[in-house]
Regions:
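N-terminal secretory signal peptides that target proteins for export/translocation
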Residues: 1-3
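Bacterial N-terminal signal peptides
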Residues: 6-17
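N-terminal secretory/targeting leader peptides
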Residues: 23-117, 129-355
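Bacterial Sec-dependent signal peptides at the C-terminal "C-region" and cleavage site
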Residues: 16-24
Length: 355
């Protein structure tokens, strides 16, 4: 054992690492916005915890706490910043009240698809901007999973014109809520546990959640027959957060383990959600023929796009960094979208109907 430890000491000294004795166990806690049972949103933290334990031989333990434990679903950033928890899992758009620039690391209406966004994050300037935005919180942020393109929501009545949006009571948070509000929608943000009852009783007329994999479990189809395709969250990225000081104290190999595990868990969650939604969509079409799947008419979509641009331009006029990130994303998306139209959409369009 002594000879093995001596070898490790030599390796750390040579390569500038930080030595952790074979008897030391590093224990971290991770707080997430979601209940522990809400898969696949809650899947990435557990995946990271399992991978880290296995890769470190049980010497690096990350204990995962769902919101049922810490009771502060929207307090994750503050808890990680203040080192109540070394890590957190949430979504960046929840911190728009602290810094509007955080929205760019979740999604924006009419923005990039999941693959386009990951390409921007990892092979464009995305991670550079993420670091810049989160530095002020003394927190490191990393991609933490993705729901893919989300559905546009459940509606009690059909939306045929822009006028139909006026006076509509809808649960739709974040930037999309601001966009809808400009078109006369009465926007509200109701906790997930109250959504079904609110829709059933007519407290709200419509809501957006995620997609068929999660929506059918909530039972929305029982009280709102119109299910609209999306526009507002073309790629909804989650995030891991790490307290900067806690991270800096880690040995280099543990830092590498963390980055590897987070990246793997992030990709796995996207695949898990896609698979779950594909199965749920097929089952939904068979079991609930009363559901009317719709897309918003072109005039409504144009109004939503115009409203989106106005909201973004409003923030850009007051915030130089916001404007810079927006321009950077648009430039990247211009190239990425051309390939998306060929690589996936082109294939589907070309082979559609071929048996």
């Amino acid at each position: 054992m002594k000879s093995i430890i001596s070898v490790w000491i030599w390796i750390y000294l040579v390569f500038g690492g930080i030595f952790v004795s074979a008897n030391d166990v590093i224990k971290w806690k991770l707080a997430m916005t979601w209940p522990s049972t809400l898969k696949p949103l809650a899947s990435p933290p557990f995946k990271v915890s399992e991978m880290i334990k296995e890769m470190s031989g049980g010497k690096f333990i990350i204990e995962v706490h769902g919101k049922e434990k810490h009771k502060a679903a929207l307090g994750i950033l503050d808890m990680v910043k203040n080192k109540q928890y070394e890590m957190g899992h949430s979504t960046s758009i929840y911190w728009k009240g602290k810094d509007i620039n955080t929205i760019w690391f979740t999604t924006v209406p009419f923005g990039m698809t999941t693959k386009e966004q990951y390409a921007w994050l990892y092979y464009g300037d995305g991670m550079k901007y993420m670091k810049q935005v989160y530095d002020r919180f003394k927190v490191l942020s990393f991609p933490g999973g993705n729901t893919g393109s989300q559905m546009g929501g459940w509606f009690r009545k059909e939306i045929k014109t822009v006028e139909d949006l006026k006076g509509l009571k809808m649960r739709i948070p974040g930037l999309a809520g601001e966009v809808m509000a400009r078109l006369g929608v009465n926007v509200t943000n109701i906790p997930g546990g109250e959504l079904y009852t609110s829709l059933d009783r007519g407290t709200i007329d419509a809501l957006e959640w995620v997609g068929p994999g999660m929506d059918i479990k909530m039972g929305f189809h029982k009280v709102a027959p119109y299910y609209y395709t999306g526009w507002h969250e073309p790629s909804s990225e989650l995030q891991f957060m790490i307290n900067k000081k806690a991270y800096e104290k880690l040995p280099d190999e543990y830092k590498s383990m963390l980055k590897t595990a987070m990246k793997a868990a992030s990709a796995d969650m996207y695949i898990e959600n896609f698979a779950e939604s594909a199965v749920a969509w097929d089952k939904m079409k068979q079991d609930y023929p009363n559901i009317k799947v719709k897309s918003f008419p072109l005039p409504v979509m144009k109004a939503l796009k115009k409203s989106t641009d106005e909201v973004l331009e409003g923030y850009a006029s007051k915030n130089e960094l916001f404007k810079e990130i927006w321009e950077n994303q648009k430039e990247f998306m211009k190239k990425a979208r051309k390939w998306s139209l060929i690589e996936e959409y082109g294939y589907i369009k070309t082979t559609l109907g071929v048996e």
